[in-house]
């Protein structure tokens, strides 16, 4: 595993915009470029094969731990409010279908990957991983800037397409509403998912998350025309929804969510402790606990639900800023990320492995400027070098 420097493509910004990726530049809330045009991470085929095996094993373990937590009545430990327990259990018992999730891993090129956390319900950086880095590779190959035979671990687009086709073919999903916050990245992500669904036979329309309606005399959530929403592809965190004024509707609506309501368990960082409990000898699962202090001092403390590295405490450091500081926490054994030097300082990459349904399908990398991956992280493409 190496970090390679490359000159920017002459028209790289235009190329990103062509595939719907428009948030690549720095902003006040993301003060560094979100897309890394000047470097990539390189792996050997053997390293990627090992990552695939590790990530698939972790996917299986995560889903098994999810089912055990739900069926064992341990959802309170995961931070899921009591009024939702029956609905989450019903979603699991129905086997409500899933489209995707992302596993975030620590890996330095040797040995096994280790699970840092699971982005189960609202994973982003999807267009970057599925489309933009593939376009980047094609451009680099065409320009002769990488060796012939260079490839990527990237069948994300194909995997998601097949998963939508499965929902249409086997699960009766022929129409869905697609919804997100009114943010450029979120809208682009659900638009991409809607395009994939449409190609697979699932028609769809967009509405903003704050436009999803409720009515006491309706069994379903409602769209802006007050028509029933039967399937909702909702890029909106369940933990936001269950704290809203309409939270009670989550527990009794007949609207089926994509991602399903059972993903509230998968997405809780408390599941990291359940994973360690179930698989204490796995080299892929870091020790973790819901009892602070029981693992000693060399731990990372994380709220059960948090985003962009907020309210995370590394060993010997103060807590990062954020809005999740009042939530219960999980403590996880500290796994040091590898360090790679860039011209303007060190980079600490986290490997995001994408899962379509229950099958791993590709890799995306975000490199932070600190050991907590936060809003100063940059997406970096990757390559698999040909065997010499």
Where are the regions a protein language model picked out?
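Preference for protein termini
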Residues: 1-388
